[in-house]
Curated annotation (Swiss-Prot):
Listed pathway(s): Porphyrin-containing compound metabolism; protoporphyrin-IX biosynthesis; coproporphyrinogen-III from 5-aminolevulinate: step 4/4
Role, per record: Catalyzes the decarboxylation of four acetate groups of uroporphyrinogen-III to yield coproporphyrinogen-III.
Gene, per the UniProt record: hemE
One GO term describing the cellular component: cytosol
NCBIfam families in the record: hemE
Positions marked as site (Transition state stabilizer): 85
Record's protein name: Uroporphyrinogen decarboxylase
Amino acid sequence: MSERATYAARRVLPDAPLLAAAEGRAPGRRPVWFMRQAGRSLPEYREIRSGIGMLESCFDPALVCEITMQPVRRHGVDAAILFSDIVVPLKAAGIDLDIVAGTGPVVANPVRSIADVAALPRLVPEEVGAVAQAVQLLTAELGSTPLIGFAGAPFTLASYLVEGGPSRNHERTKALMHSDPKTWHALLGTLADTTITFLQAQLRAGVDAIQLFDSWAGALSLAEYREFVLPHSERVFAEVESAKVPRIHFGVGTGELLGAMGEAGADVVGVDWRIPLDVAARRVGPGKALQGNLDPAVLFAGSAAVEKQVRRITAEADAALAAGATGHIFNLGHGVLPDTDPGALTALVELVHSL
């Protein structure tokens, strides 16, 4: 993956608040969007997805476009995020997996040895052509709203492949990491290649920013993260740097890893709800923007409680800016919960924009 990709000219969106905040410029208003904003919280999403499997949906460009647009139309958020799933590039490459309702991704043949790693198929851009087509449809429809592309980080993809599905303790993943570092690094190197190819395909198609989701990194100690994960995430960010778009790095439960995650090369570090943004800024260090960090569960507590927490978070974000953070993008500290009232999200957008 040493050959640098080339990217066609993309949309010029000088006034987009999200891009301004991510790039260290002064936005016209505080930008806000939500992880998992296109999803089960929206009745129009549930209707259009009825009877259609998750992975099938992710490879239908017109459907991806419509689902991605739904929260932009409804909530007035400052960014769209491509409707997809972190295992899409694995499926596209030919790995036998499915997304099982109520469980998540399930892998038919878990990876447990160096031979298993060697047998993994490599992703080529043509295999995610449907995703690229969806990006092109979206950039034609979004107007001045930026489109965020995304991928799963090598560690999180590795956990799914090693465990065979979601895991509470990641015991097989950690066992492989510690008992057979050679196989571990070979696996993450292969998955970094997959992630890079997937992101480059989205960037060539015209996404305006990218986010790397390391959903399970919070299961690691700082020492484990630095030794077994950071070099591979660094390579992902380095390989897409030439696209010159904002790069966001996010993981759940990663308060103790924020400094190292900031070192990986992103322009923006996502923060979950467990740590105040001004504290996060000190851990990340100056020169990075921050994204976050309302607890998704607070949206069930009523408008007064939401407003109280939003005012706290924006004050902490302003303190982070004073301490050297280069921008703030308001978001939740994790994805929108399925039973969230869509009206609460719309009201949250209006509140953030009013402050």
